[in-house]
Amino acid sequence: YTSDANAEDYRANININAQLDAQTLINHGQGILDGYLSGQSDVDIALELNFTEQGFNYRAQVKSDLVGLTSKLPAPYKKAETQPWVLDAVVQGDDISNLITTQVNKQFYFNAILENGKSQFSNAHFIIGKQDLGLNSQDLSVTINLEQTELVPWVDLIDQIISAAQNEDDPESQGIMPPLNEIVANIGMLDFSSMVFNDFEMRLAPEQSNVYLKLNAKELRAGVFIPTSQRSQPIRFNADYLRVNFAEQIEAPITEAAKVAPDTDLTWLT
């Protein structure tokens, strides 16, 4: 702990060592990453407090190697307990609002604003990809930019984010996440139960208390209506274009060629 002061200003620097608990993080995040994240890890916090004639402001730098935490997310977001991942977060604010910026291993980013006196983030943005895209324009957005991945392992996480961001009628039941604005994905190659889609684009957004999903790829152009207000209603799928490529079919030319053995008798061809 260090501090300095003069007749007008006072500044304090405080270094804190704390422990990041995955379950506590999940609970405060309304269940997001439940079943994916576990364990505990030490974090170092460098807190700077400034009291000036113009008002109060602060800045907290949070760093950790996240050793002790385990991630069961799909690759490249899967992490063993002993594997180091760099966590670098900054929380800064004044007597009006607070800005949160977080990056994990330069693969995951979270940015949000929390106004003083409010219990819910605004302009929140989860980014899964290599580039930090900053704050969202409103509410909660999720951006997924990956070269290739499988769809099924991500479904539960997407459902957790949608559930956490649902805007309940009872204000007391609202959590820290704002209502969902959209989930946007751009994936070079998507594997959905061995069906392969190239240059895959997805946009999921609320529509009159339900969810509408727009899908585009080289092999697909479709819209999906998912009822959430009345779950007894059927899911409606409308496709303008669909061509199904299976992973086995893509590998077929190589596989068939490999079936020709070097010692095969081909004398009958001459």
What role is predicted for each listed range?
Residues 1-98, 113-270:
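Membrane-proximal interfacial segments on either side of biological membranes
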